[in-house]
Amino acid sequence: MSVRLVLAKGREKSLLRRHPWVFSGAVARMEGKASLGETIDIVDHQGKWLARGAYSPASQIRARVWTFDLSESIDIAFFSRRLQQAQKWRDWLAQKDGLDSYRLIAGESDGLPGITIDRFGNFLVLQLLSAGAEYQRAALISALQTLYPECAIYDRSDVAVRKKEGMELTQGLVTGELPPALLPIEEHGMKLLVDIQHGHKTGYYLDQRDSRLATRRYVENKRVLNCFSYTGGFAVSALMGGCNQVVSVDTSQEALDIARQNVELNKLDLSKAEFVRDDVFKLLRTYRDRGEKFDVIVMDPPKFVENKSQLMGACRGYKDINMLAIQLLNEGGILLTFSCSGLMTSDLFQKIIADAAIDAGRDVQFIEQFRQAADHPVIATYPEGLYLKGFACRVIVM
């Protein structure tokens, strides 16, 4: 008999709507013993079967659902089916947009909670973020090897969230050859170098692909400030869009060095690109105090909020940094501003920008809205999957 997680009375509603998480407060009891990440059955208070998921006793998310199909086992065949289903959409996108790199698995939205897989050419970069994902590591890798024999697999599960579920951080080659120090990929006509082994996340922010392309429409003959530039994707796109100058700011000299290489790799005019190692908050104040002005500012900060207790502080951070950006823009200038914090809703983020404009003594018009690229889908039953949001704002004086 399988181990069963029994829900408290009335706590089955989210599962009936096919939401993939069971929180600790919804659990009445466990029937049997399960190890970390083991597959269990989830039933309502009367014993009616609801779902099959992975057990995580140390997490607030006590179980993550693998399947709502009673007849479906969690095995190599299960992972193969999920991977093949996800690949169909990525194949279409890759063909339409000319991509050689994309997010293959976007966790819950692809029916594989806690699993992220990015494909960069013939390298699959894996992040296992939950106990259940780690427990199923061997089955997942077996499925990947069968479906993608041409690909090497590299593990970047060196993510702090694993500690919340009682797991160590892991990183290293799984199968195949080690990725090069810098792997060239292609995106909307750009060549970009990706550091799979040591870069942020899996090496590159694929989710901002469409936003980088959209930037080009605003930058012709403009002076651009690219904040939190990382390896310069927005800077390269701005140069391809015909900007007069782009200033890229980041605290990492290693990232800025790659950004410079990316400009050179695309045979763009390096004299139009400036790379500044500095704290963005500090530098924006310095620019303001000495009267610097820009026509376009890209504001793409790291996640400011990890949990609800940090949300108020994050709101202040987003407000301050956008206020400074708005102050630096010429009249008619464009602010392209983003938040990758899942707890920050689009409505709240828009309100923060509006408040920032008031504090800056300017008016802004919202002219375009952004979200994560289409290889990062959001399944309807898991709205939390929409984490990246952004706006193009035009600064005016009424």
Swiss-Prot record:
Residues in PUA domain copies: 2-79
E.C. number(s) listed in UniProt: 2.1.1.191
Coiled-coil segments on the chain, per record: none
Pfam family of the protein (one): Methyltrans_SAM
Domain of life of the source: Bacteria
Function: Specifically methylates the cytosine at position 1962 (m5C1962) of 23S rRNA.
Protein name: Ribosomal RNA large subunit methyltransferase I
Taxonomic source organism: Shigella dysenteriae serotype 1 (strain Sd197)
The gene coding this protein: rlmI
